[in-house]
Amino acid sequence: MLRWLADAGLLCVVKAVKGQAVLATLDDVVFHKGVKLGDIISIYAEIQFVGRTSVEVEMKALRGNELIANAYGSYVKVDRNLRPLKIEEIIEPDDQEIWNVAMRRREERLQKIKDRNERRFDVTNPTIGFRYIITNSLNVTPDLTYNGVTASAGRILKIMDDTGGILCLNYIGYPYSNGHVVTAAVSRTSFYSPVMLGDYILIRGCISYVGRTSMEVTLNVIKYEPQSGITEHVTTTYFTFVHIDENGKPIPVKQYSPETDEEKKEYERAIQRRKKS
């Protein structure tokens, strides 16, 4: 689902700006309903605001008229060297109120990522000191790219989702326990460095919070460029998974108590994040 949302937003932007674009930030994603095998899902993307080089897009997943998931994304028009490119196309708002809300959302986001250049080179491992961890690494092959050059943000998000889900399955003791896990939400995800064909990416994850039926996983992605030897931070975000039974109903997760200093600090930060959501 994450990949569908991200890719739908990209296609919408590429068509509107008549050029290449990349996903810069995916705002809080909320999954309202579960999806079963055989369900027919429609993905919609709508431009809500256009800046000098960036576009704000709302993405929705619907089953009939039922809202399954929604998200907001910020995409940047870029040249062949992935440098921001001015949007020449004039796009007038259909709804001025929606336009203004999207503009404020963009301004708020930009305030929170003023240090994005510093974050780009922060490759600190956030899983050190945690007991429940997972790592996943892969080489970026053509099937993981949009155009044979730039890695698809949607595909990276899908791999992150799968990695976090596996960690949660391990935590609940699958396959020796009842139930499965589903993705319930993804926090704001900003991409600090582009991933290119041939790069290696490393995904590091840890369980940072456990509630009655849910688990929060911190997921950090770094990339390694084999030709230059440079390692950069791609993104760090939080996925929330819910433990469900065979009927899709939430069921309790085994009790969790933070033990290490790192776990205790992150647990408190997770509580604050949940209060703000």
Model-derived regions, located:
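Catalytic strand-loop segment that frames the active site of acyl-thioester-processing enzymes
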Residues: 1, 104-159, 163-173, 276-277
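A cross-kingdom feature marking solvent-exposed beta-strand/loop segments within repeated
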Residues: 22-42, 71, 181-193, 202
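Short, basic/aromatic beta-hairpin or loop at an interaction surface
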Residues: 14-22, 171-182
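HotDog/MaoC-like acyl-thioester-processing domains
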Residues: 36-40, 44, 48-113, 196-197, ...
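N-terminal, Lys/Arg-enriched amphipathic/low-complexity engagement segments
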Residues: 1-9, 14
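A short beta-loop-beta micro-motif enriched in histidine and acidic residues
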Residues: 17-19, 28, 151-155, 177, ...
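Catalytic cores of nucleotide-enabled group-transfer and carboxylate-activating enzymes in metabolic
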Residues: 7-10, 25, 135, 141-152, ...
